[in-house]
Amino acid sequence: MNRKTLLVSGVIGILALILIAARTFGQSDLAKIRRATAQFHRTETAKAAGYDLRPGLDHCFDNPGVGGMGFHYIDAAALDTKVDLLHPEAMVYIPSPDGLQLGAVEYIIPQDQWDATGSTEPPMLMGMHLHLNKDLHVYIMHAWVWKNNPRGVWEDWNPNVSCP
């Protein structure tokens, strides 16, 4: 094997390892989120832990033709400028024939609090930026860890979810 072939093979091998590690890291984080939120499959448990429907947000979020989100049970005490992978600010419950089922978690930072930090970049979690919901004035990121979302784990709207 000549030197150039050996060098190219080495670079390809290193890139493959980096990609595998990155994918494993992301999957590992999703597994951590699932373990941390498994206790909240019942809304009663979420309520006991401080998550609840909030005035004005106490309905099923639906975007006809795009998908739904469901009902957001929010821990108002957790709304600050920090996000914690294992303690999401909201549990998102989806309607089902058997009642509400945990479908996703949501990370939330109020825009006014984030702006007060002086940061010019949106907040981040796991190397990804939260995005601004201009209607609600919050930075958000959904993680569909309990209900498959064919559009992606991190997408807001899930075409597999609809509101009654």
Regions found by a protein language model. Give the residues of each.
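Positively charged n-region of N-terminal signal peptides that target proteins for export
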Residues: 1-4
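Bacterial N-terminal signal peptides
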Residues: 10-18
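Primary mode marks residue(s) on the alpha4-beta5-alpha5 output face of response regulator receiver
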Residues: 25-164
